[in-house]
A protein has these predicted regions:
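Canonical leucine-rich repeat
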Residues: 14, 35, 63, 83-84, ...
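Concave beta-strand-loop units of leucine-rich repeat
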Residues: 1-10, 18-31, 41-59, 69-70, ...
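Short, well-ordered coil↔helix boundary/capping segments
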Residues: 167-171, 204
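Extracellular/surface-exposed low-complexity segments
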Residues: 200-223
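Short amphipathic alpha-helical segments and helix-helix/interface helices
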Residues: 65, 177, 210-211
Length: 223
């Protein structure tokens, strides 16, 4: 079944240890500090628009979704949330927006889907050790200096990949450009690495890799 927990100013914690499947919306709960759905394993099919949401809970520090493996989830405007892990998540979409104290994330089994990270200004790194097919949009995170996706082989949903307006170094920009040489499609990719603060143009081999990508019919923007 579906769950809607909204605008409950006296709710401090929410736990459903046996809840396994459905949509949930948890938002605008001014005293909520923890959400625990440890048995929840699947949202609706991944074609559904972001059915699982946890938004605008200003005191929330803990989210437990140990078994969640398939679906679409949005975590937004939870300003005390420092850690968000999905240890079982495999396929779907993860959107993390404006969680200003978020510093740690972990998605060790995420292999196929969409990931967006925006305006999370405390996080310094995000890693996707097993992502093979995906769309990454990682934008406007002022402390972010490292993004890794060693097993990515294919882009999806428009062939766009963006890492702009972060804090990536020239070395990290070089690394991403080199990786994109082998990510399919070979041509038609739109790659954005511009707007780093401070500016971080490609250097050395990175300049060569950028030109190779452009010569192969890709659009590449850097500082």
């Amino acid at each position: 079944g579906d769950i809607n927990i909204e605008s409950n100013s006296s709710l401090n914690s929410f736990s459903l240890p046996n809840y396994k499947k459905g949509e949930f919306t948890i938002g605008n709960n001014s005293s909520l500090t923890s959400v625990a759905l440890p048995s929840y394993y699947s949202g609706l099919p991944t074609s559904t628009t972001y059915a699982q949401t946890i938004t605008n809970n200003p005191l929330l520090t803990t989210i437990v979704l140990t078994s969640f493996n398939l679906g679409n989830i949005t975590i937004k405007n939870n300003n005390l949330l420092a850690t968000f892990n999905l240890p079982s998540f495999n396929n779907g979409s993860i959107l993390l927006f404006s969680n200003t104290n978020l510093v740690n994330t972990s998605f060790p089994n995420f292999t196929d889907g969409v990931f967006e990270l925006r305006d999370c200004n405390s996080i310094q790194q995000v890693n996707f050790p097993n992502l093979t097919t995906g769309r990454l949009q990682i934008l406007y995170n002022s402390s972010l200096n490292s993004v890794t996706f060693p097993n990515l082989t294919n882009l999806k949903f428009g062939d766009n990949i963006g890492f702009y307006n972060n804090n990536l170094s020239s070395s990290m920009v070089n690394s991403i450009l080199n990786k994109m040489l082998t990510v399919l499609p070979a041509s038609g990719k739109n790659i954005r690495l511009d707007g780093q603060k401070p500016v971080a143009p490609p250097t050395g081999q990175g300049i060569i890799d950028k030109q190779t990508l452009i010569s192969n019919g890709n659009n590449v923007q850097t500082d």
